[in-house]
Amino acid sequence: LAADAERLSARTQPLDDRLREAAHFALAAGAARIEREHVDAAIAAHRRRHERIRLGHLDQILRGQWLIDTAGSHVGQVNGLAVVPLGEDSFAHPQRITATVRAGAGEVIDIEREVKLGGPIHSKGVLILSAFLAARFGWMLPLSLKASLVFEQSYGGVEGDSASLAELVALLSALSGVAVKQSLAVTGSVNQFGVVQPVGGINEKIEGFFDLCAVRGLDGRQGVLIPRANVCHLMLRDDVVEAVRAGRFAVWAVADADEAVELLTGVAAGVPDEQGRMAAGSMSRRVVEGLRKLARMQREFARRGHEDDADAAGHRGRPHAS
């Protein structure tokens, strides 16, 4: 109820409800007092009564109506995690986030904002990740790109900055051409220095991705990346904890965007040194190579435009034979 491993909830009404239901299970079992298994049974029964919408979301994914991959790798595509509030309860499901890039003047387009589906906090998160990109690479070369970010198959409002880490990784993937593992999902916000910040609904998010992976079959490669600052909030279901202990599922706590990049791609982040040097083959090196390619394209487009203008002016200045 408190969604915190170090705190207890002071909301007495839901606690009373669980205790009464646990007492019912204890009485039915002929127990003299309420034991842990009776409390677990009460919590499980409560979840079953409130999971119709959650199961509907899961069914849409399994039937291929809602496109979510849990295997393979794709460029510019990341599994984010979205929370759906349902009164006093909530659940989470994976949400595909994609990024595309082309030559431009350094603009990062938030499609959710453009169509008025994105809230101010989400828009702030996109601006912050854009600032991180400019701060890390903009002093070495011009950001001659135009990028687009979107929550795919999102037909309602998008608010909050908890997907900004996923959006940043999708953008870096699109720029570098490095594919992102679809067996992993990620949540967390980032600041302008790439530090990963805590977010809400952390347990629901992990359990939401776990449920999908469990139905499709756990193979030890699936998992969720969370902010390190959220570790104190972990209160996961027993089946999730058991899967992690058995090595069939994983939860990684990351402190910065570079850690997340390395886990999600398997490629070293390659943080630039004071001279701007980066390890060959690293993500940062490949991003710079992608930016240089876009800059060359931009210059070529501009040169062709000037030549076309000159040709047009020359044609206009020639006398016509009568």
What are these regions (language model features)?
Residues 5-9, 29-30, 88, 116-120, ...:
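Generic amphipathic alpha-helical segments used as scaffolds and interaction surfaces in large
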Residues 11, 15-18, 32, 90, ...:
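Active-site-proximal structural scaffolding
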Residues 41-42, 48-119, 130:
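Core mixed alpha/beta domains of very large multi-subunit molecular machines
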